[in-house]
A protein has these predicted regions:
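C-terminal active-site-proximal or functional interface alpha/beta core segments in diverse enzymes
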Residues: 91-195
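Active-site-proximal beta-alpha core segment in soluble small-molecule metabolic enzymes
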Residues: 1-120, 142-145, 187
């Protein structure tokens, strides 16, 4: 997934991918045929926005007002374009399964009318499954109930930071220091927000 693709990279990305998710209908319309020509086996999806997230830090909340991430339900056509095979929803950040359960209700409320038209659903990352105290049994139960309701949908969960959680140190380098109005800021060669 990327919020936007460009002409000079889409062929290479499609050739290296089994799935390709577009962030908007305009990106889908611009690149889906080119992606299919580059890789006839690629499965194309669309990032959708359930307009609900319990992420408290606005910087990390992809459902905050004015977001650039995903298509809300009221912007989707009743009949999806034939090449859209899946939905991608990413609206968690270090959350537990209780948050996923509440979020899933919003996802179903908004997007279940299209579930018959797709083959897979990617619930994104941000599920901190490896954190001590994470309720794995609850997550499994939630996913089993969902699969019972929608047996044709392949469910995808991204590992995200959960698999690197507390596994080592982040090593970076100060590459510059900028000053503005008496505030000095170190510019590092790593990103605080990788998404």
């Amino acid at each position: 997934f990327s919020p936007a693709y460009t002409d000079y990279e889409i062929d290479e990305i499609a050739q290296c991918s089994s799935h390709l998710v577009f962030n908007s209908l305009s990106q889908f319309n611009r690149f889906h045929l080119q992606s299919k020509q580059a890789n006839s086996n690629i499965s194309i999806g669309l990032r959708v926005n359930p307009e609900y997230s319990e992420v408290e830090t606005l910087l990390y909340n992809p459902c905050a007002a004015g977001t650039r991430f995903g298509v809300p339900a009221d912007k989707l056509p009743q009949q999806l374009p034939a090449d859209i095979e899946g939905f991608h929803i990413h609206c968690h950040c270090e959350n537990d399964s209780d948050v996923f359960e509440r979020t899933l209700q919003h996802i179903e409320d908004k997007f279940s009318p299209w579930f018959k038209q797709i083959k897979w659903i990617n619930f994104g990352g941000g599920h901190l499954m490896t954190r001590k105290g994470y309720d794995i049994k609850r997550l499994v139960s939630i996913l089993q109930k969902f699969k019972t309701k929608y047996p044709h949908l392949k469910v995808i969960l991204e590992p995200g930071s959960a698999f690197a959680w507390q596994t080592g140190s982040l090593v970076s380098q100060v590459v510059d220091i900028v000053e503005d109005k008496g505030i000095s800021t170190a510019i590092l060669n790593v990103s605080f927000t990788c998404h």
